[in-house]
Amino acid sequence: METHDLTLDDFLSRFQLLRPKMSRDVLNRRQAAVLIPLVRREQPGLLLTKRASHMRKHPGQVAFPGGAVDSTDASLIAAALREAHEEVAIPPEVVEIIGVLPPVDSVTGFQVTPVVGIIPPDLHYHASEEEVAAVFEMPLSEALRLSRYHPLDIQRRGHDHRVWLSWYQHYFVWGMTAGIIRELALQIGMKP
């Protein structure tokens, strides 16, 4: 499938046909969740944020709305929805959850579960100044084009890691966020 003619219906049919398996390896790990907000349009969008530069962790980085699970969250999905509401004012009740991707281990010790949801196109985002410097939308067809991501092999704490790098307009998309977008593309059958 070519990404330039990817409709939301195409994405949904492929996502539902290729449901990801959930990991059961969650013992002794701090849990977090991010929302992958797909904007419902004929040519869908992917909503991303740029973290505030004064944040202690990952300042200025492009990210999905999300964060640590807290005691008020009934589930990982609830955590992703709560964080998206806190960070960019997406009302939880307007998000249509379509599934999750396998969890990803973060460099900060969290196991992060990406939650995929569809949001209406007419939302008015309000970035929390404490956490978010900018909110932007990238065409989903562009985000899922695997050739836009370039690998960088690094060593961290004596282990080899591959991170992915990309640019969209003036936004540098890399690390866990780029890796999650790539996994989403691979999960719906995009070819490298």
Curated annotation (Swiss-Prot):
It is an enzyme of class 3 (hydrolase). InterPro entries: CoAse, NUDIX_hydrolase-like_dom_sf, NUDIX_hydrolase_dom, NUDIX_hydrolase_NudL_CS, Nudix_NudL. SUPFAM superfamilies: Nudix. CDD domains: NUDIX_CoAse_Nudt7. Transmembrane segments: none annotated. A motif (Nudix box) lies at residues 67-89. Mg(2+) binds at E83, E87. The gene is nudL. Its cofactor is Mn(2+); Mg(2+). One of its GO terms (molecular function) is manganese ion binding. GO terms for biological process: nucleoside diphosphate metabolic process. It holds the Pfam family NUDIX. Probably mediates the hydrolysis of some nucleoside diphosphate derivatives. Residues 29-160 form the Nudix hydrolase domain. This is Uncharacterized Nudix hydrolase NudL. Belongs to the Nudix hydrolase family. PCD1 subfamily. Keywords: Hydrolase, Magnesium, Manganese, Metal-binding. Its EC number is 3.6.1.-.
